[in-house]
């Protein structure tokens, strides 16, 4: 210790005194992946994971998405919550599929990549499902297909609309043909809804690709997308390597798809609840949500 350090009061740092590290709680601040702004975690969560600086739509967990859709302080019932994935094929690549399942369940806190619930939206009954991209990239396996089909069946029994928020890399390769079968299974479930005259609204979020985009994600009576979402079967890099041409700017983004008639609307996540309420009320010939709220 130097003679100066001995003379200085204990609360004052000298050149040789190490600075004390301040502990910042994990998750308190997040960085926008688009503009790089530092964002206060609780405020970002309240804004539904949309950057207040540049309006970039960041990833949002499935439960948070569904909670933002259904009426607050009302009961919701989770559909087929007890279902969990099984490694039927004993699949192994760099890891065993069973190990991947356990790791994803631990990291995400979910049994699989799709959550389905029954509740109310502005007082009207609704069934909704949402993908959680944190679980194996939102890939579609047997549990995802079964939960989707059961959710459609509940909507059929209740006689209410069905909404699905897609965020997926496509079919889950570790389940092989069992995964591909879900494309037909989910499409057939939507066929039964259509026969009953019940609306299905598909909300495509970033990213929606592969077998999910080639099945129920594009089968909505109305297809809505979030801004700048990547939507397509194969990724742009794969397509460029195949056709050996440079793709147009913004190719496979929601704005490009809207301009070319592949989707019906683009809606900001913060306005999604009101938009879906208006559309479902109109399609079910129910009172306008604002009129119902006023009453």
Curated annotation (Swiss-Prot):
One Pfam entry name: Zn_ribbon_ACC
Cofactors (names): Zn(2+)
Family, as annotated: Belongs to the AccD/PCCB family.
PROSITE patterns: COA_CT_NTER
Function: Component of the acetyl coenzyme A carboxylase (ACC) complex. Biotin carboxylase (BC) catalyzes the carboxylation of biotin on its carrier protein (BCCP) and then the CO(2) group is transferred by the transcarboxylase to acetyl-CoA to form malonyl-CoA.
Molecular function terms from GO: acetyl-CoA carboxylase activity; ATP binding; carboxyl- or carbamoyltransferase activity; zinc ion binding
Organism annotation: Xanthomonas oryzae pv. oryzae (strain KACC10331 / KXO85)
Protein name in UniProt: Acetyl-coenzyme A carboxylase carboxyl transferase subunit beta
InterPro entries registered for this protein in UniProt: AcCoA_carboxyl_beta, Acetyl_CoA_COase_Trfase_b_su, ClpP/crotonase-like_dom_sf, COA_CT_N, Znf-ACC
Top-rank taxon: Bacteria
Presence of keyword Nucleotide-binding: yes
Biological classification of the source: Bacteria, Pseudomonadati, Pseudomonadota, Gammaproteobacteria, Lysobacterales
The record's free-text note on cofactor binding: Binds 1 zinc ion per subunit.
Alphabetized UniProt keyword annotations: ATP-binding, Cytoplasm, Fatty acid biosynthesis, Fatty acid metabolism, Lipid biosynthesis, Lipid metabolism, Metal-binding, Nucleotide-binding, Transferase, Zinc, Zinc-finger
Reactions accelerated catalytically: N(6)-carboxybiotinyl-L-lysyl-[protein] + acetyl-CoA = N(6)-biotinyl-L-lysyl-[protein] + malonyl-CoA
Principal subcellular localisation of the protein: cytoplasm
């Amino acid at each position: 210790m130097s003679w100066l350090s001995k003379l200085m009061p204990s609360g004052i740092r000298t050149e040789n005194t190490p600075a004390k590290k301040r502990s910042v709680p994990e998750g308190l601040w997040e960085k926008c992946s688009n503009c790089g702004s530092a964002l206060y975690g609780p405020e970002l969560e309240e804004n539904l994971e949309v950057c207040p600086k540049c309006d970039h739509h960041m990833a949002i967990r499935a439960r948070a998405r569904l909670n933002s859709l259904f009426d607050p302080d009302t009961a919701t019932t989770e559909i087929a919550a007890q279902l969990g994935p099984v490694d039927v094929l004993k699949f192994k690549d760099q890891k065993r599929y069973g190990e991947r399942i356990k790791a994803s369940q631990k990291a995400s806190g979910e049994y699989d990549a799709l959550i389905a619930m029954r509740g109310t939206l502005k007082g009207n009954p609704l069934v909704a499902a949402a993908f959680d991209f944190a679980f194996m990239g939102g890939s579609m396996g047997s549990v995802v297909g079964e939960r989707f089909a059961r959710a459609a069946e509940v909507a059929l029994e209740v006689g209410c609309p069905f909404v699905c928020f897609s965020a997926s890399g496509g079919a889950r390769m570790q389940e092989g043909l069992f995964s591909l079968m879900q494309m037909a299974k989910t499409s057939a479930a939507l066929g039964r809804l259509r026969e009953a005259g019940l609306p299905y609204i598909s909300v495509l979020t970033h990213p929606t690709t592969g077998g999910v985009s080639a099945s129920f994600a594009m089968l909505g009576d109305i297809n809505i997308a979030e801004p700048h979402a990547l939507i397509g079967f194969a990724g742009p890099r794969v397509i460029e390597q195949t056709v050996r041409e440079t793709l147009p700017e913004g190719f496979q983004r929601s704005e490009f798809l809207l301009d070319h008639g592949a989707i019906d609307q683009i809606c900001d996540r913060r306005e999604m609840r009101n938009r879906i309420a208006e559309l479902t009320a109109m399609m079910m010939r129910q009172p306008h949500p604002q009129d119902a709220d006023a009453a």
